[in-house]
Regions:
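Sec-dependent signal peptide recognition
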Residues: 1-7
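Hydrophobic h-region of N-terminal signal peptides that target proteins for export
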Residues: 7-17
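Short cysteine clusters
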Residues: 207
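A conserved hydrophobic position in a structured secondary element of the catalytic/binding core
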Residues: 210
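Cell wall/extracellular polymer interaction/catalysis modules
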Residues: 21-204, 213-226, 230-240
Length: 240
């Protein structure tokens, strides 16, 4: 019950803060509202025009307040969506402390550097790859670690260390790779994505997860220059 309560509070806050939007099959009709004051004070906000913020409820908690913001021509920030979300099973950790298999979501400032999914391209501004059964995400330290690979090109990939993307048919309908460990340093961690909620698990293996309908709106709204900020709610200076 202690774990569920923060999520229920987040749900209530998200629904209260964000007006209902009509369903659409094209780009989402985003009823933007003023972003909370703390968003404009984030160091990343100085040069960014779009922010995706993951505010974890605590270092050892699996829930987060997730929001997306855009800067207008006048310099003001507007919140275009907000939702409760999940982070790693073991909470958050400093970027430098992250290790493969730690089941923690790294704290830091990143970019989305790849868009992909099992579903067809929803209209993403970042070049999108619709995957098939040949697509794997390498966790093999000796073969293109932390990259998407085609098994036909890397037939000796260590499969037990890697993710077969189509096996995650709930979570990986739509995905954005968070640019953690872009250098591919073996053992630092791989496959840190933003993806859809998985079934029956209020946590992830280290990724960030949001409801599928929200993920679809993110895919249709995100730009290549979007800055991803992950930290605790408290350290971000967040307040209602």
């Amino acid at each position: 019950m202690k774990r569920i309560l923060p999520l229920l509070l987040l749900c209530a806050a998200a629904h209260a803060a964000e007006p209902a939007r009509p369903a659409t099959t094209n780009a989402p009709a985003l009823a933007a509202i003023d972003s909370p004051e703390w968003v404009a004070k984030l160091p990343a906000a100085t040069n960014a025009t779009q922010l995706f913020v993951v505010a974890g409820i605590g270092m050892d908690k699996t829930t987060a307040f997730v929001s997306m913001h855009e800067k207008g021509a006048d310099g003001s920030w507007k919140q275009i969506l907000s939702t409760p979300g999940f982070v790693g099973k073991n909470g958050l950790c400093a970027d430098a402390d992250h290790r493969e298999g730690c089941a923690q979501t790294p704290i830091g400032v990143y970019r989305f550097n790849k868009a992909f999914g099992i579903a067809p391209d929803p209209g993403c501004a970042i070049p999108y790859v619709q995957v098939d059964g040949n697509a794997w995400w390498s966790g093999d330290p000796d073969r293109q670690y932390n990259q998407m690979v085609d098994i036909r090109d890397v037939p000796d990939l260590v499969l037990d260390d890697s993710e077969h993307i189509v096996d995650y048919d709930y979570q990986y309908q739509y995905c954005l790779n968070i640019g953690f460990n872009e250098d591919g340093t073996p053992g630092r961690g791989s496959a840190i994505f933003l993806h859809c909620f998985g079934p029956q698990k209020p946590w992830t293996g280290g990724c960030v997860a949001v409801p599928k309908d929200v993920m679809l709106r993110v895919m249709r709204s995100v730009r290549a220059d979007c800055v991803v900020v992950i930290d605790t709610f408290e350290r971000l200076g967040a307040s209602w």
